[in-house]
């Protein structure tokens, strides 16, 4: 529970490299996510190459932190593995698990949306040489935090409805 409430979007990182063990731990958390009919329609592209990380902000306006990140992981949906249209939910669950594991491991992270924005999908597919059946869903930027952000309580009782919709 601590990681859930402590997790914050971190966009500034130190120069310390992430170990392969930490990256694997984060990937294992992503792959532990629930998926519809247990299809697990995901693939993950680890980006450590600074030249590639510098290209992404040219087409993704909210990814300016990537050149300073230790690495990024692109969460992709594989339409050849998905029997239906639930792969975005599955990739969302995988992305969230990765953010929580990063927090638990002391790594800063931020979720960068790709899908369904074609102006982000197509350039990223080209940059990473992704096959036609692979759709980039999100990018998780990772690095040792060079900033701190305090957790906040987002619970809002006015958004809770019991049995049917009523204003509380």
Task: Name these PLM-found stretches.
Residues 1-168:
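Acidic, surface-exposed loops and disordered segments
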């Amino acid at each position: 529970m601590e990681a859930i409430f402590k997790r914050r979007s971190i966009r500034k990182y130190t120069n310390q490299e992430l170990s392969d063990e930490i990256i694997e731990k984060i990937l294992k958390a992503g792959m532990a996510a629930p998926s519809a009919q247990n299809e697990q329609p995901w693939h993950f592209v680890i980006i450590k190459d600074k030249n590639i990380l510098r290209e992404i902000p040219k087409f993704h306006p909210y990814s300016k932190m990537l050149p300073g990140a230790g690495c990024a992981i692109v969460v992709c949906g594989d339409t050849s593995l998905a029997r239906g249209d639930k792969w975005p939910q599955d990739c969302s669950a995988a992305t969230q698990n990765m953010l929580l594991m990063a927090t638990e491991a002391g790594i800063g992270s931020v979720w960068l949306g790709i899908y369904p924005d074609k102006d982000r999908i197509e350039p990223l597919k080209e940059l990473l040489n992704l096959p036609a059946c692979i759709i980039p869903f999100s990018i998780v930027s990772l690095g040792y935090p060079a900033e701190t952000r305090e957790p906040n309580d987002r619970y809002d009782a006015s958004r809770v409805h019991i049995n049917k919709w009523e204003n509380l």
